[in-house]
């Protein structure tokens, strides 16, 4: 099952988003940025500003693998969505 959350500034969604992120720590996720680039890897940390730390990260552009990173930091204001992926 794939679960997706979008960024939102409303306080009603804060608890649901926090619970979603807590559930995703240590799991594979896809993070899509506003510019269309996707990062796929293991979610390690996410903070209240949507800043994200991932491990085993791969960068995709137009569905094609561009680069592999060990660790990756994504600034929250660039995040369009985070999608939890099934465990492999």
From Swiss-Prot:
Main location, first listed in the record: cytoplasm
GO biological process, one term: mRNA splicing, via spliceosome
Cell compartments where the protein resides: Cytoplasm; Nucleus
A Pfam match: LSM
GO molecular function: RNA binding
Residues covered by the Sm domain: 16-88
InterPro entries: Lsm6/sSmF (IPR016487), LSM_dom_sf (IPR010920), Sm (IPR047575), Sm_dom_euk/arc (IPR001163)
Gene3D superfamilies linked: 2.30.30.100
UniProt entry tagged with the keyword Cytoplasm: yes
Record's subunit section: Component of the heptameric LSM1-LSM7 complex, which consists of LSM1, LSM2, LSM3, LSM4, LSM5, LSM6 and LSM7. Component of the heptameric LSM2-LSM8 complex, which consists of LSM2, LSM3, LSM4, LSM5, LSM6, LSM7 and LSM8. The LSm subunits form a seven-membered ring structure with a doughnut shape.
Family membership: Belongs to the snRNP Sm proteins family. SmF/LSm6 subfamily.
Role summary: Component of LSm protein complexes, which are involved in RNA processing and may function in a chaperone-like manner, facilitating the efficient association of RNA processing factors with their substrates. Component of the cytoplasmic LSM1-LSM7 complex, which is thought to be involved in mRNA degradation by activating the decapping step in the 5'-to-3' mRNA decay pathway. Component of the nuclear LSM2-LSM8 complex, which is involved in splicing of nuclear mRNAs.
Name of the protein in question: Probable U6 snRNA-associated Sm-like protein LSm6
The species this protein was found in: Dictyostelium discoideum (Social amoeba)
